[in-house]
Amino acid sequence: MIAFGAPRRRSFGLLFSLAPHLFFLFLIGTLANKLNVPQVLLPFSREPGRVPFLLEAQRGCYIWHSTHHDAVTIQPLYENGTSCSQRAVLVAESTQPIRLSSIILAREVVTDHELRCDVKVDVIDNIEIVSRTRELYVDDAPLELMVRALDSKGNTFSTLAGMVFEWSIAQDNESSREELSSKIRILKYSEAEYSPPDYIIEMEKQERQGDVILVSGMRTGAAVVKVRIYEPFYKKVAAALIRLLVLENIFLIPSHDTYLLVGAYIKYRVAKMVQGRMTEVNFPLEHYTLELQDHRLTNGGLPSKSVALLDEKTAMVTAVQLGQTNLVFVHKNVHMRSVSGLPNSTIYVVEPGFLGFSIHPGGRWSLEVGQVYVITVEVFDKSSTRVYISDNLKITFQFSKEYFEEQLSTSNGSYHVVKALKDGVVVINATLTSSLQERNSSQPKTYQISHQQEVKIYFPIQLKPSFLAFPHHPLGISNRFTVQVEGGSGNFTWSSSNETVAMVTTKGVVTAGQVRGNSTILARDVQNPSRSGDIKVYVMKLNKMELLPFQADVEIGQIIEVPIAMYHVNTETKEAIAFTDCSHLPLDLNSDKQGVFTLFKEGIQKPGAMHCSSVHIAATSPGHTLVTVSVTGHEEHAWSSATFAAYEPLKALNPVDVALVTWQSVKEMVFEGGPHPWILEPSRFFLELSMEKAEAIRVAEVRLPAKRKQNQYVYRVLCLELGEQVLTFRIGNHPGVLNPSPSVEKVQVRFICAHPASMLVTPMYKAPSGTQPCPLPQYNKQLIPVSSLRDSVLELAVFDQHGRKFDNFSSLMLEWKSSNETLAHFEDSKSVEMVARDDGSGQTRLHGHQILKVHQMKGTVLIGVNFAGYSGKKSPKGISNSPRSAGVELILVEDVTVQPENATIYNHPDVKEIFNLVEGSGYFLINSSEQDIVTITYREAESSVQLVPAHPGFLTLEVYDLCLAYLGPAVAQIRVSDIQELELDLIDKVEIGKTVLVVVRVLGSSKHPFRNKYFRNMEVRLQLASAIVTLRLMEDQDEYSENYMLRAVTVGQTTLVAIATDRMGKKFTSAPRHIEVFPPFRLIPEKMTLIATNMMQIMSEGGPQPQSIIHFSISNQTVAVVNRRGQVTGKSVGTAVLHGTIQTVNEDTGKVIVFSQDEVQIEVVQLQAVRILAAATRLVTATEMPVYVMGVTSTQTPFSFSNASPLLTFHWSMSKRDVLDLVPRHSEVFLQLPAENNFAMVVHTKAAGRTTIKVTVRSENSSSGQLEGNLLELSDEIQILVFEKLQLFYANCQPEQILMPMNSQLKLHTNREGAAFVSSRVLKCFPNSSVIEEDGGGLLRSGSIAGTAVLEVTSIEPFGVNQTTITGVQVAPVTYLRLSSYPKLYTAQGRTLSAFPLGMSLTFIVEFYNNIGEKFHTHNTRLYMALNRDDLLLIGPGNRNYTYMAQAVNKGVTVVGLWDQRHPGMADYIPVAVEHAIEPDTKLIFVGDVICFSTQLVNQHGEPGVWMISTNNIVQTDTATGVGVARNPGTATIFHNIPGVVKTFREVVVNASSRLTLSYDLKTYLTNTPNATAFKLFISTGRNVNLKGSCTPSQALAIEKVLLPETLMLCHVQFSNTLLDIPASKVFHIHSEFSVEKGVYVCLIKVRQESKELRQVLSVADTSVYGWATLVSERGKNGMQRILIPFIPGFYMNQSEFVLGHKDTGELRILGVERVLESLEVFHSSPFLAVSGYKHSMLTTGLTVYLVRIVNFTAFQQMSSPAFINVSCALTNQQEAVIVRAKDASGADHCEDSGVFKNFVGSYQILLFTLFAVLASTSFIFLAHNAFLNKVQTIPVVYVPTTGTTQPGSYTATCSPPHFLSSRPPLVQSRLQHWLWSIKH
């Protein structure tokens, strides 16, 4: 909860720190929720009904609380019976008449937000009456008066609800004394139609008055209403008074302000409201008078005159002069004259300004011919205010008699009724010509004001057609029809009376057809909406359609419009109504023959004058068909059909126009097309051929064979006489009933018979269609080429004297000859083959063909043809003029070819490509497959084709030989292309100083390259971004590219692009090729020495950056092997060469390109000996020096043997431990490295003395070949001398000396800089003072000379004191260096680290020492660092000089070597081991595993760090303790962070649980015995246990309280016996837990409280229990494993008491399964009882009976304590007891009878079961079924009755019937029977 006084900043901080899902609730609570009032003031009262107040919140549910219950109580109000309260009632409970206060707090139950209300209780000091008005009207609505109470400070009380007041009418001192109740009356709310508050209704029922009342006016006058508080306590509070005036509700007509002209008058009327109706009042008035007051004159008026005069008798006001005055009501009663509510009116006397017109109806000046209109002329003053027009005003109104007829007009001319006569535009005029006689004036006042108005008159609006009828379509297809409008202005608004039936657009387009019905479409004139026209629209059902008469046959290509009429037929009157438009209905056009007619233009349908739709069908093929037109998708199938025929156009095929034949030759004339015989009347078909001269020709009709066309008509015409005539062919059908207007067609041709005049022989050219013929015959050349490879056909044509070619000359005799038979000859020179051919004129003629045989030889031959005469017996006249011979000279040539056949041409106007044509006739047709791509110029003289490109594209150049036999054109494939792409091909990584080839290609479309001869047109050039490389054009060039030589000059990167410009000036740039010039690629080290099994990684420098993958190979893999990372492992002694290449694969060629390569010499040796490398053997005390193991040679460094497999171990020892300490590396950070990593140590000198250091190197296996001679160990030792450092003074004041290496510098600083003037100088007194230089400012520089100098530093203080200090500076060479690590690592007590934690950040610091171990203060050494592998550490220079930063990224040992580049012998080697610092191992983690993470890392104070997890939904982790639960499969990373020291991590891979493993203690089993111990079912989700790692108590607590891993597991049980109709969940309660002790999940199965019936059923149930579990996150994913749990039900007894007599025997019946019954123990507690052995029931399975009797009845009766029979079972741990009591003596006789009855009952029982057996034998089917069920279901049918005594469970031997006679069957039996007979219901 937020405190009320909290600062705003804190509130906002809390607001934004809320969880997102609470933010909305917080906003509601703080910004939206509030109480209806913040403060409440309640009146003090001693009456029983205290004053309540309703406090209400806006939203939410609240708990209300009052801080001062004695003063204020609060009662919540609940909504609709719920526990949610938004309102509460405040009641003042104060009993003291003093001011008390309380705070009401309302707390919201969800957000806990509190609302506050301050409540005060005080005494009423005074009261007053509040009213919205002080004036009432007679018979008007009543007025509400309210009491407002104030305290002594003037504060208003919040409510007075419930307080009793006395209202009364008091005497008005100002008015005359009358009866008090005559003016006003106090009303109850029940008497008025008002809705008062509920408390007022209750008070009025009790005849009390509250703080609110109603008063009503009775008659005019004044009245006083008084109120006081009824409660006696407030009798001293003064009453409140209010004075009310009651007025009459009168009106002045007109009530608005009036404007008059001078001399005009107006007569007023007065009306009043009586009982809701307005009634006019006659003058004079009873209570009022009218007066003109406040006369205000305008400038220039006469003050002696009034503005207007009033006639009081008639209420007429006459305007006198300009100005204004008020007409007011004055009350005759003097006391009422102060009333302000009486009506009044202001009268303005003005001058006229202008006139205006108004017209009715419509109010628009757009009129209609024949209509009557009212035109009103209005007068306005200069302020545009309308002036009242009196009768004495004169207005002249003028209009055209041609356009208007005046029907009525007023005397003053302001009102006219006219009728419009004709259409047109006319102007009306009005003029104010008033002559008003002013009073006391002799001159009349005249006005001349005019106005005119333009009027447009139109004809009445008429819509065409008179009505519209549309068919209704059930699919909602709408009809659209444009209504035509006549009359009106032409601009209309359209509307529909029923838009569901018909809608209309703004253009008058009616849409209807979706809904049946009718509607009226109305068109209103926009200029005058009162003018309109309408049309009725009907949407009706379509019943009938028909096709109207039309022409039935038509020529192909022509169109027939088929008109369609559709109707709605009234079912009663049979009247047919034709639809106006049905063109939008979808029509289905079906033909019995497809393809004869088709729908034209996708079915154009349009209505006409006699039809509502039409179908246009086009004749497409000859034939006839029955066309059926129907409406698709309609409710009733409407259709109509008709037959149509189509025929081809009639034409003369041969001849087309003229036929020319020789004498006695025949012309076959062919006509085609024309009408077919009409299918319905074929007998009326006719055809005829008529001629002019029948004797000159003989005509015979040729009957065509079946294979010829049916519509062709052939006639053979034989020439009998020379001459010319016209033949006419007609075809068609005669008119008939079924075809009244059939089509008839005719065509005419000319027939000529003549002598031949000339002949022509030409080779026959089979030119392709569409090409021109051979031009040789036109040129009349002497030599005509023909093919020397193929036989040629020579054609003979014959012409008459007019040059016309003959159609047939077969009657002539001819002879053929060849001049050179070796070149060509004729096989039959006498005959000629007549071939019919169309020679291009469209007419077929017969030509003479002769085959010329060739012998594939070139040459020239002359061919001749001789004419011998006619083949007839006699010849006609004039034959002597005929030709005798014709000849032609031929040249034999080969076919033409095009060179080149393929080419890609650059699209540039300067490009001209030449294609040569070789051989052929020389007469060619050049064709292109595409136009406008190139400009083709055929150069006939050169026999070539020139192509100039115009547009890009692909084309085929076809060359046709026009004068050779056609086999096909010679072709060339040509591609014209713009520049599409520039391609640069080069190796983009070049080693400095090397050269590579650069190939430039320009590609066109489809990646085809251009020839380089076009490059000059393209302006191809190369451009470099920088000059780190050079380019040189090569002399040797490829045809399709330009080649350059690129030479690398400087290391760096640049970009090379190729640039070209096309014909439009657009630049094309190739993809930039980034060229990297890299330094020479080098592998490090140049030579590598390894022992067998040792691994070291090859490093590299130089080469392309970022470096590509280096491909390693080794020359001898028996010596060493290398992997892809460059890690070399020694195999056996020997040498090998390792090659490393940087290469890539060219994407275009697929070739491997090698950028650079280098090699390393590999030597694998055996360690012959080891030696300890110590840089110095004489050291001062208190210094450190690294020592490490080396081989015999300097190349056998720790890199050579520190990473062998198996590892070598290094054991160090000393002869004297008090002289120095020998510690492993990284001991400064508390790391304890194992012996395998101790190849390097650190010597810490302690005291002066001499000691020996020894190292022993051991190999675990002599067969590994690591040591020479298969030795197992090698050793070495050295001596170290430690001496005391020279000291001049005692140790507490030892002066310091500056130690500098040679060629270094050091900047000195003092503590007085800035405060004093500090200077320094090198003293010259020392002989070697030249070893350093000093600039005077504290900068020391050492040279290349070793020695010692003295430095003097002087400080001149501002206060007059000089300080001087002298120190020594020694310059010496660096002897050795040492690597130390940082930061320090701390572990828990008793724990050590053997490696750096994974993920840790390390800092390595390099320190330098001289030959005796003194540390240098400055450095100038150039260091080189090397690693034996780079995959475990990320290492690099630190942020300070001579420091290195490293990150441990992988497990393993890395050997770090550091040495001086100028002095490689000065080196140090350290092992850096990295291991996991977080336990346990997380390799095999499954969903559900609980992991207790731990680490031995702590901070310097021994405190652990903080745990973090990368993904909490995979491994839910408690960050405080470091325990996690694997909830989902995936990968997560666990972090342990010790701030400022170390941050380590471990990756956790969570696998999906393959299967849940279930188990339980085999010694346990399930039972349903009450209070039985819980059964435990153990579940494991992984392979073993689910608990990983060892858990601390805090982690175990977090598992139990925070992580709750058991929520992952769901446990289930089920009885194995499926026939047992009891769910296991009714018997057992099951839930899951996680056991930290066992590390597995546990399902706890406990027994629920069971009913007796359930225990009874289960007691004999032979069943087990299936148990299984599922993971919540992986439900249904894996196979479910179930385990069978043994179940032993508890036995059941229905008896708790025996009442036995002297000779009675009780039967103790126990139900249970067999093994339970066998383990029962039954014993009695009294010696007077006897329990006989049990016996099994033969009829009922699972029932055992024990007999109980009393041995000594008398002694048993005298027992003071009750006797028991105890029944127990060891299997189920169940114990039951039955009380045995003795029967009293009073029931002896009855008991004897009962004993007899008992015997009878026993016999009856036997009879009952005997009867049951008999019935069973008669009902074999039932018993068989029942036996089958009993066999399957092991639950027995047991009748265990309940006793009939008053004590349930007791057994009375004499007074109870036997148990097996109980009338109520048990639950299982009834359930079994119901199940048995209700199998399928």
UniProtKB/Swiss-Prot annotation:
**Record domain BIG2: where:** 1078-1150
Q: Report one GO cellular component.
A: membrane
The primary site where this protein sits is nucleus
Q: What membrane topology is given?
A: Single-pass membrane protein
Disrupted gene: phenotype observed: Knockout animals do not show any overt phenotype. Males and females are fertile, with no age-dependent decrease in fertility. In males, spermatozoa have a uniform moderately abnormal head morphology, frequent flagellar anomalies and decreased progressive motility. They do not show compromised histone removal or nuclear compaction failure.
Tell me which Pfam families the record gives. Answer: Big_2, Ig_NUP210_15th, Ig_NUP210_16th, Ig_NUP210_1st, Ig_NUP210_2nd, Ig_NUP210_3rd, Ig_NUP210_4th, Ig_NUP210_6th
**Signal sequence residues:** 1-32
Going by the UniProt annotation, this protein carries glycans at 80, 344, 808, 1441
Tissues expressing this chain: Expressed in testis.
Keywords, A to Z, come to: Glycoprotein, Membrane, Nucleus, Signal, Transmembrane, Transmembrane helix
Q: Which domain of life is it from?
A: Eukaryota
SUPFAM superfamilies assigned: Invasin/intimin cell-adhesion fragments
Keyword Signal carried by entry: yes
Annotated TM spans: 1804-1824
A Gene Ontology biological process noted in the UniProt record is: Sertoli cell development
Compartment annotation? Nucleus membrane; Nucleus, Nucleoplasm
Q: Record's family?
A: Belongs to the NUP210 family.
* PANTHER family, per the entry: NUCLEAR PORE MEMBRANE GLYCOPROTEIN 210-LIKE, NUCLEAR PORE MEMBRANE GLYCOPROTEIN GP210-RELATED
Q: What is this protein called?
A: Nuclear pore membrane glycoprotein 210-like
Q: Which gene encodes it?
A: Nup210l
